[in-house]
Amino acid sequence: HTLGFEPVITEREIKGYSINRVWRAVKRECLYLWANGYVTDVAEFDRGWMTEWHSNIGPFKLMDLIGLQTIYNIENSYYAASGDERDKPPAKLKEMIDAGHLGMKTGQGFYSGYDTEAGNLDVGKK
């Protein structure tokens, strides 16, 4: 509890365990919607998410916080394990990473304008 996490028992081992698998489904769908042009304003999407789910952060900003290279690596590990093309991270995400847009770490990701020294979550504009 000291780290702010709540333990969740998973009865059998599964890649990603339980909470991370649900988060993965959210990430995967958000990335799909964004990469295929269904969501073009990630800030608007995040605001809708936060309102709907009573959350203090949306999935796109959370991916920026985690780091887009980390997100890509995690998604790619699922793809490597399954071989299913639906698990492959979108090329558009790789293009962002190759351009040096890694999220909060570099000040540019889905959002821009992060204070990379302070790590302030409230900063960052689409």
Predicted regions mapped to residue ranges:
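NAD(P)-dependent Rossmann-like dehydrogenase/reductase catalytic/cofactor-binding core
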Residues: 1-20, 24-126
